[in-house]
Amino acid sequence: MANELKQARGKLEQSTVKKYELLTNDTIELGGGITLFRIKALISFGNVKKGELGGYVEKEGNLCHSGDAWVTGDARVTGDAKVTGNAKVYGNAKVTGSAEVTGNAKVVGNAEVCDNAKVSDNARAFGNAKVSDNARVTGNAKVYDNAEVCDNAKVSDDARVTGNARVTGDAWVSDDAWVTGDARVTGNARVTGDAWVSGDAKVSDDARVTGDAKVTGDAWVSGNARVTGKAKVTGNAKVSDIAEVTGNAKVYDNAKVTGDAWVYGNAKVSDDAWVSGSAEVYGNAKVTGNAWVTGNAWVYGNARVTGNAKVTGRAKVTGDAKVTDNAKVYDNAEVTGDAKVSDNAKVSDNATVSGNAWVSGNAKVYGIAKVTDNAWVTDDAWVFDNAKVTGNARVFGYTNITGNANVTDNAKVSDNVKVTGR
């Protein structure tokens, strides 16, 4: 018992021993009656030697006498700010307001921690970084260059916030994520995993960027949108609402992915294209130009939707099919294989265009009609009902192929002819 009391008394004495003093002959006047005092070590501790000069504090409450915490160089700790634990503040760094630097954290260079902000654990703030308001920088996180973390934002784990980046609002950057350049992460946004947000990109609202995803350039991810996997959103692209871009998908240029849309696999959406509604674009599909894929439409495989084309409803464009120019595919229609729909052509209802077929001009294919093989329907021709155009057949002019008619082989139907069948 005696030994235990002796040890306890020793620890108490050690904890109350002052490790530094305030020098009254080396001060800085800040105005408003505030004086800062340089500190001098009274004992050796950590890497600090007895007699070593430190930085400046306003009062002893700014730097804890226990632990190895230290302020050195021309660093300043003022107001109700605290440096505790084994934390280090040095260079020209400033810790002000009611801020706290604790644990093994370091605040270096011209960095500033102010207001009610806290830098803890093994976190680092250096360069011209600023951590303010109620922000938290924890774990092994680093905030540096001219980066700023403010409001209620958090940066944790091994995350990095660099360059001129800002993390604001209730945003959280964690894991091994990077936010750099002039990027902004705000609102309730989360950037996690190995994600990268750079350039002038923005991640806002309740958006999530995670995995190995990259959001760069002037891209904007907002709403409840998700960018995950190895996906890339670049240029002036926008992903919003509850849309998701994942896998190895890329959305770039001025493209938009909105609504409940899903772009995944190796799909690419570029130029001024728009994928919206509950549409899905996946596989190796590409949506480019001013094309629009919306509703519950699916574009997949190696399909291409380009120009001013529109794919809507529950339509499907798949295989190596192409829908281009001002063409429209809608309702439950399907364009598949190596088929092509171009110009002002329309494919609707439950119609199918497949094989190497080509529907062009102002042609219309609808009902449960089928155009397949190497068939070609063009000009103002209409193929509808249960009609079929197959083989190497050609249908053009103002022709109507209707009923159960079957135009096949090398047949050619033109002018104002109407072909019907029972």
Regions picked out by a protein language model, each given a short descriptive name:
Residues 420-422:
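Low-complexity/repetitive intrinsically disordered segments
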Residues 70-418:
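Intrinsically disordered, low-complexity repeat regions of secreted/extracellular protein precursors
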Residues 1-66:
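Terminal amphipathic alpha-helical/low-complexity segments used for targeting or macromolecular assembly
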